Amino acid sequence: MTVTVTVLVPAQTANNSQSTVYTATGVTAIIDKFTATNYSGTAATISVNLVTSGGTAGNNDLIVKTKTLQASETYTFPELVGHVLRPGGFISTLAGTASAINIRVSGREVT
């Protein structure tokens, strides 16, 4: 077994349509840190799904629903830390506003 500490999702702006931002391709992934920053001048929301292989993002795998970040607020999502994605599982996000929230996810990949 090999464990690699890595950036699962490089810093990027969350889309305002449901979007896959990471897939555990051939690995088991463990989320260690998930950070979101609202860089806009007004409040904005973000939702996060952890979806099993072959699944579709929806209410059954919604972990964080419409978390409101105030202008310039950063949030580190303790509710996501320690979650495991089996091979083929993925992280999907949905921002309520375009061009408002940046995300970055770090963790471990196990092969």
PLM regions and their residue ranges:
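Intrinsically disordered, low-complexity Pro/Gly/Ser/Thr-rich segments with frequent PxxP/GP/PP motifs
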Residues: 53-90
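Ser/Thr- (and often Asn-) enriched beta-sheet segments in non-cytosolic proteins
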Residues: 4-6, 45-47, 66-68, 74
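The feature marks short-to-medium sequence segments in extracytoplasmic or secretory-pathway proteins
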Residues: 44-55
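A generic structural signal for short beta-strands and their flanking turns/coil linkers
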Residues: 30-32, 44, 73, 87-89, ...
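C-terminal interaction-tip segments
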Residues: 1-29, 33, 54, 94-111
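Intrinsic disorder/low-complexity detector
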Residues: 17-18, 40, 51, 61-63
